[in-house]
C-alpha cells in the first residue's frame, strides 16, 4: 500500500507548496480534507489518524492542538512546520545536514520539527564551526537576514501585493523583530550550540521568494585565529557529499560583485559562501536559499522522504 500523507493546513502558503510538490508523486496517497471542513476538529482528527505521515502547516497553537488530537495514536508520524516544537527534546530537528547521524535520527523519528527558514541558513553557517571547535560557544554571534515576503504567509503576501489592502506595505525593504525577541532565536541558539543568545536582525524585501542570511565574524575571536581558507575548509568538509547544501569555492566567491537573494527561488538547494580578504581578520559567512524551498516546504518533503526511506 502507498503511504498516506495528510497536509493539515494545505491551503496556506507552505501547505500549498508541499501539495504542489507531491502532486505528481505516484508512490504516495495524499489525503485531503475539504476546505470547507478544515475547522471541523473531529474530521481533522480522523484524517490525522488515517495518515502514515501528517505534515502540519499551521500556526503554533493549531499545531499543538493537532498533536494533541493524535495522543494515543502513535502510528501517525508527524512533521511540524511551525515553531512550536523546534526546541523540544522529544522532537528530532529536521535539518538533515545538521550533523553526523542527523539523517538517521530524522528517518527513525516519529516526531520531526521542520526548521525555520532563517535558522536553516544561520545554523548551516554556525554549527560546523562550533562542531569543529573554531567558534567559541560564548562568541557574540550576529545574524542579519532578508527574506522574500512569502515568508510572512498569506497575510503579508496580500499586504505587499494588494494596494487596496487596509494594511498595505509600500516599503521595498523593512526591518522587523526590532526588540530582538524574534521567535527563531531559541532555535538558533540551541541548534547552533551557542551559550550566548545571538542577535538576530531579520528583514523583508519586495520579492516573493528567496533569502540571504549573513553571519559576520572577527577571526581574532575564533579559536587559533583561523584563515579564511581554514573556515572554508571546515564548511566544505562538513557538507562533503551532500546534494542539497553546497559550499561555493573561495575562488568563485572572490569573483562575485554581488549576491542575489532570488538566485535560488523555486529551488530546494542552499549555497554557502565565505567572503573576506585573507589577512584582514574578518569573514562574512553567507547562506543563499529559497525561504519556501530549503527554508520550508522543500525541507518538509526532504524529511518526509527520509522518514519513508526514500532517500
From Swiss-Prot:
Top EC class for this record: oxidoreductase
Coarse class of the protein's main subcellular location: cytoplasm
SMART domains: Semialdhyde_dh
One cellular component term from this protein's GO annotations in UniProt: cytoplasm
Superkingdom of source: Bacteria
Pfam families listed in its UniProt record: Semialdhyde_dh, Semialdhyde_dhC_1
Cellular location(s): Cytoplasm
Pathway(s) the chain acts in: Amino-acid biosynthesis; L-arginine biosynthesis; N(2)-acetyl-L-ornithine from L-glutamate: step 3/4
Database matches in InterPro entries: AGPR_AS (IPR023013), AGPR_type-2 (IPR010136), NAD(P)-bd_dom_sf (IPR036291), NAGSA_dehydrogenase (IPR050085), Semialdehyde_DH_NAD-bd (IPR000534)
Enzyme Commission no: 1.2.1.38
Gene Ontology biological process terms in this record: L-arginine biosynthetic process
PROSITE patterns assigned: ARGC
GO terms assigned for molecular function: N-acetyl-gamma-glutamyl-phosphate reductase activity; NAD binding
Reaction catalysed by this enzyme: N-acetyl-L-glutamate 5-semialdehyde + phosphate + NADP(+) = N-acetyl-L-glutamyl 5-phosphate + NADPH + H(+)
Keywords: Amino-acid biosynthesis, Arginine biosynthesis, Cytoplasm, NADP, Oxidoreductase
Catalytic residues (positions): 117
Similarity comment: Belongs to the NAGSA dehydrogenase family. Type 2 subfamily.
HAMAP family associated with the record: ArgC_type2
Function: Catalyzes the NADPH-dependent reduction of N-acetyl-5-glutamyl phosphate to yield N-acetyl-L-glutamate 5-semialdehyde.
PANTHER family: N-ACETYL-GAMMA-GLUTAMYL-PHOSPHATE REDUCTASE, CHLOROPLASTIC-RELATED (PTHR32338:SF10), N-ACETYL-GAMMA-GLUTAMYL-PHOSPHATE REDUCTASE, CHLOROPLASTIC-RELATED-RELATED (PTHR32338)
Name of the protein: N-acetyl-gamma-glutamyl-phosphate reductase
Taxonomic source organism: Brucella anthropi (strain ATCC 49188 / DSM 6882 / CCUG 24695 / JCM 21032 / LMG 3331 / NBRC 15819 / NCTC 12168 / Alc 37)
Lineage, broadest ranks: Bacteria, Pseudomonadati, Pseudomonadota, Alphaproteobacteria, Hyphomicrobiales
Amino acid at each position: 500500500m502507498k503511504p498516506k500523507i495528510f497536509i493539515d493546513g494545505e491551503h496556506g502558503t507552505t501547505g500549498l507548496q508541499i501539495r504542489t510538490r507531491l502532486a505528481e508523486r505516484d508512490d504516495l496517497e495524499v489525503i485531503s480534507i475539504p476546505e470547507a471542513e478544515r475547522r471541523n476538529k473531529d474530521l481533522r482528527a480522523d484524517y490525522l489518524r488515517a495518515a502514515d505521515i501528517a505534515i502540519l502547516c499551521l500556526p503554533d497553537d493549531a499545531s499543538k492542538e493537532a498533536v494533541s488530537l493524535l495522543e494515543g495514536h502513535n502510528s501517525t508520524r508527524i512533521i511540524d512546520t511551525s515553531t512550536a516544537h523546534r526546541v523540544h527534546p522529544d522532537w528530532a530537528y529536521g535539518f538533515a545536514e545538521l550533523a553526523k547521524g542527523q539523517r538517521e535520527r530524522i528517518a527513525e523519528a516519529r516526531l520531526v520539527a521542520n526548521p525555520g527558514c532563517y535558522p536553516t541558513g544561520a545554523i548551516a553557517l554556525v554549527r560546523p564551526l562550533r562542531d569543529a571547535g573554531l567558534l567559541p560557544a560564548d562568541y557574540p554571534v550576529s545574524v542579519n537576514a532578508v527574506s522574500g515576503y512569502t515568508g510572512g504567509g498569506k497575510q503579508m503576501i496580500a499586504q505587499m501585493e494588494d494596494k487596496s489592502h487596509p494594511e498595505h506595505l509600500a516599503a521595498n525593504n523593512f526591518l522587523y523583530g526590532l526588540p530582538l525577541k524574534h521567535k527563531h532565536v531559541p532555535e538558533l541558539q540551541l541548534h547552533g550550540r551557542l551559550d550566548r543568545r545571538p542577535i538576530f536582525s531579520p528583514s523583508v524585501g519586495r520579492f516573493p521568494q528567496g533569502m540571504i542570511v549573513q553571519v559576520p565574524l572577527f577571526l581574532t575571536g575564533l579559536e587559533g585565529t583561523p584563515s579564511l581558507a581554514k573556515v572554508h575548509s571546515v564548511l566544505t568538509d562538513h557538507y562533503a557529499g551532500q546534494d542539497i547544501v553546497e559550499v561555493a569555492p573561495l575562488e568563485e566567491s572572490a569573483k562575485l560583485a554581488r549576491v542575489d537573494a532570488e538566485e535560488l527561488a523555486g529551488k530546494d538547494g542552499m549555497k554557502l559562501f565565505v567572503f573576506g580578504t585573507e589577512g584582514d581578520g574578518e569573514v562574512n559567512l553567507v547562506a543563499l536559499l529559497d525561504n519556501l524551498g530549503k527554508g520550508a516546504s522543500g525541507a518538509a518533503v526532504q524529511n518526509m522522504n527520509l522518514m519513508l526511506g526514500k532517500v
